[in-house]
């Protein structure tokens, strides 16, 4: 078994992660005759409920601020023991004055789930919190509320990167967060494969995540750490945008070198195809769109047939850790479309007669950058994942040939490419927007092609960050941040030296 532990840091991260977990729950089958391609033990843990019944809950830690959990309780129906209506006053014989905060009323969607009724149609108006469309029970240890700050507070906003960094330091000093929160989940794993983090990177959660990843790297050594770093894509006032930009720069400078995979995600993306209808002001809708690409791109990590996803990301030398997230929604009739190939029993880079052996530059959705000029960029490494359609009949090379092909690509300065195909289509659940996609199957599913791409576009983004940091950041921090961003940028630049360059030397 190769388990993956997940950490969810903050409101925007929890919106995206809730869609992710709802999708994982939808893959469960309840009949021995039904087989699934998904190994549920990767993300779910068995346990015992309060009444002695068996449970199956996510391997995750959900961090958020006070007031951000909505109607979600730490102790749910699986783990809640019945208590006496009047427990008595014990040794105290004086008057009691009990003050309780007004509880948040569960959404109609949650009420219907609890009663076993058909779920009502959700809308941007009816979703107030990420818990309003959550379909799972979590273990009580998974729910971690940080009471030092309150959601959307005007008095103490959780916005500055240093605030998150300081909060983690204070909590870790008092409680040892890894020992208190993460270790119980880690000790349950037979063979921990990776740690996956959902976090926003342009506010205080970026600082919190940076300190957390630093501790994870100390504790878990060479284990893979995958970070989904959410950045606000909506327009804001200039001074707020500068603050966001500096928070993003600090996050990518501190977190990406410690990560195996760092994916900046624009929420929402700048450009949308005509086939997608999106309420850009709704976090529920924008995170649902992101989940189609993010969940598809990582689907190989959950297959029963083990895939060495980490090697695919590493490319030839493992120097590129910042990847772009891109996707394309494909029509049901795939007869005239490009198709990546992956035999469920044999994984590898390969060439074929069609376009499936070539890297893709054009996608309908680009979740990482708002620069439309992608044609001139150099691609170092790309992992493509296609789902929901039958691949063209192609014969992959043997494993013996794959290493040679990879070396040939490297020495010829060609992009490293890995393609996966999974016949499981992306399901449109009742917890997601119903009419977001105009192209979909009759059975409420869609075909998706997603990609994780390491390219020279990252160098352009980092260079812009350096310029802003040089103007805005204080003197004490400026040199370290600008130089650090410059060192990361060098890995994503393409520098060609001719023979005359050497002759001049």
Curated annotation (Swiss-Prot):
Residues 333-358 are annotated as: Disordered. Gene3D superfamilies: Tubulin/FtsZ, GTPase domain. It is found in: Mitochondrion. This is Protein dml1. Keywords: Mitochondrion. It holds the Pfam family Tubulin_3. Residues 344-358 have a biased composition (Basic and acidic residues). Its main location: mitochondrion. CDD domains: misato (cd06060). Involved in the partitioning of the mitochondrial organelle and mitochondrial DNA (mtDNA) inheritance.
């Amino acid at each position: 078994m190769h388990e993956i532990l997940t950490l969810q840091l903050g409101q925007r991260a929890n919106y995206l992660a809730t869609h992710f977990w709802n999708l994982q729950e939808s893959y469960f089958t309840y009949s021995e005759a039904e087989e699934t391609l998904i190994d549920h033990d990767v993300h779910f843990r068995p346990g015992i409920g309060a009444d002695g019944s068996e449970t199956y809950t996510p391997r995750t830690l959900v961090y958020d601020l006070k007031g951000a959990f909505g109607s979600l309780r730490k102790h749910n129906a699986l783990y809640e023991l019945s208590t006496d209506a009047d427990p008595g006053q014990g040794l105290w014989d004086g008057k009691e004055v009990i003050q309780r905060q007004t509880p948040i009323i569960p959404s109609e969607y949650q009420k219907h789930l609890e009663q076993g009724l058909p779920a009502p149609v959700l809308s941007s108006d009816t979703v107030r919190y990420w818990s309003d469309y959550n379909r799972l029970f979590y273990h009580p240890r998974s729910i971690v509320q940080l009471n030092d700050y309150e959601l959307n507070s005007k008095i103490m906003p959780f916005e500055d990167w240093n605030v998150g960094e300081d909060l983690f330091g204070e909590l870790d000093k008092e409680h040892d967060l890894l020992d208190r929160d993460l270790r119980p989940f880690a000790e349950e794993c037979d063979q921990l494969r990776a740690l996956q983090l959902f976090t926003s990177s342009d506010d205080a959660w970026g600082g919190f995540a940076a300190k957390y990843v630093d501790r994870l790297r100390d504790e878990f050594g060479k284990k893979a750490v995958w970070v989904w770093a959410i950045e606000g894509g909506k327009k804001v006032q200039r001074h707020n945008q500068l603050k966001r930009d500096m928070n993003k720069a600090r996050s990518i400078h501190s977190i990406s070198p410690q990560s195996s995979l760092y994916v900046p995600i624009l929420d929402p993306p700048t450009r949308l195809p005509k086939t997608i209808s999106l309420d850009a002001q709704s976090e529920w809708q924008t995170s649902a769109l992101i989940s189609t690409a993010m969940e598809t791109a990582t689907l190989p990590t959950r297959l029963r047939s083990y895939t060495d996803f980490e090697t695919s990301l590493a490319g030839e030398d493992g120097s590129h850790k910042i990847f772009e997230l891109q996707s394309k929604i494909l029509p049901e009739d795939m007869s005239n479309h490009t198709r990546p190939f992956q035999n469920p029993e044999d994984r590898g880079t390969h060439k074929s007669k069609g376009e499936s052996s070539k890297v893709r530059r054009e996608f309908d959705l680009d979740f990482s950058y708002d620069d439309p000029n992608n044609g001139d960029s150099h691609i170092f490494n790309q992992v493509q994942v296609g789902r929901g359609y039958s691949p063209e009949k192609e014969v992959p090379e043997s494993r013996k040939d794959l290493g040679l092909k990879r070396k040939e690509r490297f020495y010829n300065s060609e992009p490293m490419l890995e393609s996966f195909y999974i016949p499981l289509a992306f399901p449109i659940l009742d917890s997601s927007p119903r009419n977001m996609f105009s192209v979909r199957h009759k059975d409420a599913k869609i075909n998706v092609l997603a990609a994780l791409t390491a390219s020279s576009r990252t160098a352009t983004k980092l260079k812009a960050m350096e310029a802003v940091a040089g103007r805005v950041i204080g003197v004490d921090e400026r040199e370290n941040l600008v130089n650090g961003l410059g060192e990361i940028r060098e890995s994503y630049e393409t520098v060609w030296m001719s023979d005359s360059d050497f002759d001049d030397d």
